[in-house]
């Protein structure tokens, strides 16, 4: 019987289209081969495995869409989709280079399991899958010093209104220190800059009581301070969905996927640890959503955080991640 905490329910139950909200889940790991991982996932969800190159597998049969298992290395994936006939010098050279790169990458590049957008109540199925993968030998960030593996959530927005988006940003920025402490991010991931915190100047701008920009200004401000995917809460997929040309003019990165979701990148993947699952990161994320839902409490938190950031002595004496707990307790 699992001793993990239950996955708490949503506050915002429906998406911007009025349907049940969905979420995409991405989990990085090592310790298993592409085919081994694909077969375990396929068996768990009763799916069919299709080969999509030497380093990618598509798992078909889920009404929500295709699951994907892939090596998280774009160059190798592109090479893996090319047929090697071996009847020319260039084919042989490419094959040799690919083999060398594959051998080197296996030491540091994770496999990634990517779900389709699934309804939130199916997260329990993902939690059960994590337990199976752990038993099968999957390894996460703390299993090897060089592992810098993450788990990412892509929850659909309950509304695409600019004010709602700003509320999510305000809530996340106010709770970032608390979330980061709770997540206990591995030093290797911190060094790699995959989940850099937001610049202090941007934080101060967003949490100001009069910061309620329209969509164009919101996106422009974000791009001015954050022209990168490497943020704990990456807004670029959502902003590309809303205004592709505006985003690509500043952050033209092929890895920015256009989708009406937030992209929460902070948590480590500690798959392989028996007590680990998606429950803690999910339940902590819901504190952001609860704060978004409660506008009056959000205003109070923003005001308190502004005061804290404006006083160096306060920052020296106290830690914001401890002070903000008082506001979280109001919802208990």
Please tell me what each predicted stretch does:
Residues 152-154, 263:
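Structured core elements
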Residues 156-158:
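Catalytic palm subdomain of template-directed nucleic-acid polymerases
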């Amino acid at each position: 019987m699992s001793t993990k905490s239950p996955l708490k329910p949503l506050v915002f139950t429906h998406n911007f289209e009025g349907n049940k909200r969905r979420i995409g889940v991405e989990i990085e790991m090592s310790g298993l081969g592409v085919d081994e991982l694909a077969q375990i996932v396929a068996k768990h969800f009763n799916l069919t495995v299709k080969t999509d190159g030497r380093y990618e597998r598509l798992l078909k049969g889920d009404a929500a869409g295709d699951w994907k298992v892939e090596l998280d290395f774009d160059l190798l994936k592109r090479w893996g989709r090319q047929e090697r006939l071996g009847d020319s010098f260039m084919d042989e050279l490419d094959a040799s280079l690919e083999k060398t790169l594959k051998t080197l990458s296996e030491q540091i590049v994770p496999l990634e399991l990517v779900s389709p957008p699934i309804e939130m109540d199916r997260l329990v199925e993902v939690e059960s899958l994590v337990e199976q993968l752990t038993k099968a030998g999957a390894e996460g960030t703390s299993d090897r010093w060089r592992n810098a593996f993450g788990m990412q959530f892509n929850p659909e927005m309950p509304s695409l209104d600019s004010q709602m988006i700003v509320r999510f940003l305000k809530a996340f920025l106010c709770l970032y220190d608390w979330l980061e402490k709770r997540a206990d991010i591995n030093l290797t991931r911190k060094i790699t800059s995959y989940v850099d915190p937001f610049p202090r100047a941007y934080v101060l701008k967003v949490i100001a009581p009069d910061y309620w920009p329209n969509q164009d200004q919101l996106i422009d401000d974000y791009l001015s301070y954050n022209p990168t995917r490497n943020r704990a809460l990456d807004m670029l997929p959502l902003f590309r969905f809303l205004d592709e040309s505006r985003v690509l003019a500043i952050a033209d990165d092929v890895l920015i996927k256009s989708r009406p979701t937030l992209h929460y990148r902070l948590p480590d993947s500690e798959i392989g640890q028996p007590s680990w699952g998606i429950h803690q990161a999910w339940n902590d994320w819901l504190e952001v959503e609860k704060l978004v839902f409660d506008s009056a409490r959000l205003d109070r938190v923003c005001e308190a955080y502004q005061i804290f950031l404006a006083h160096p002595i306060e920052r020296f004496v106290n830690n914001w991640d401890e002070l903000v707990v008082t506001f979280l307790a109001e919802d208990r």
